[in-house]
A protein has these predicted regions:
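Cytochrome P450 core scaffold surrounding the K-helix E-X-X-R motif
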Residues: 44-48
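Short structural boundary motif marking the start of a folded domain
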Residues: 2-9
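Glycine-rich beta-strand-centered segment in the early N-terminal region that forms part
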Residues: 25-39, 49-103
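Well-ordered beta-strand positions in beta-sheet-rich domains
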Residues: 19-21
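Extracellular beta-rich ligand/substrate-recognition surface
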Residues: 9-17
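Intrinsic-disorder/low-complexity, polar/charged segments enriched in Ser/Thr/Lys/Arg/Asp/Glu/Gln
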Residues: 5, 17, 31-33
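Residue-level detector of conserved, well-ordered beta-strand and adjacent loop positions
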Residues: 12, 23, 68, 117
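Phosphate-binding beta-alpha-beta segment of Rossmann-like dinucleotide-binding domains, i.e.
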Residues: 95-118
């Protein structure tokens, strides 16, 4: 576990979000650390805001930022439609894992992947 911290908007109780210092995650072999420049809370997160999850919770999975650390296998495991992701790249994260080549992806868009479990 790293000793570094970063700021995060944390849901601490129902309808209460606080900016807090949180422990930075470790970068896994096939992962990357992204320094966030912008993030949003999606409509799919609202059930956590309205219900009582196991607090504290960091909401949001739609984000953009700069890649500041990459595991040794990250470039192989991350699918990027514009080429290989490199250290220092600015990226927008699309949080679905899709094939991008099946009939549903090609006909209806990648949100309708027929191969992956979305």
């Amino acid at each position: 576990m790293t000793n570094q911290t970063c700021k995060a908007a944390v849901l601490t109780k129902r309808h209460t979000i606080e900016v807090m210092d949180v422990q930075m995650p470790e970068c896994g072999r096939d992962g990357m650390i992204i320094k966030l420049e912008a993030a949003s809370i999606c409509g799919t997160d609202l059930h956590l805001f309205e219900e009582d999850p196991a607090y504290p919770v960091i909401l949001g999975h739609e984000l953009c930022g700069r890649v500041v650390e990459m595991g040794p296998d990250a470039a192989k495991s991350m699918r990027c439609y514009t080429g290989e992701v490199k250290l220092g790249d600015r990226i927008c994260l699309y949080p679905w894992v899709v094939c991008g080549t099946c009939e549903n992806c090609l006909t209806y868009g990648i949100g309708a992947c027929g191969v992956c479990d979305n």
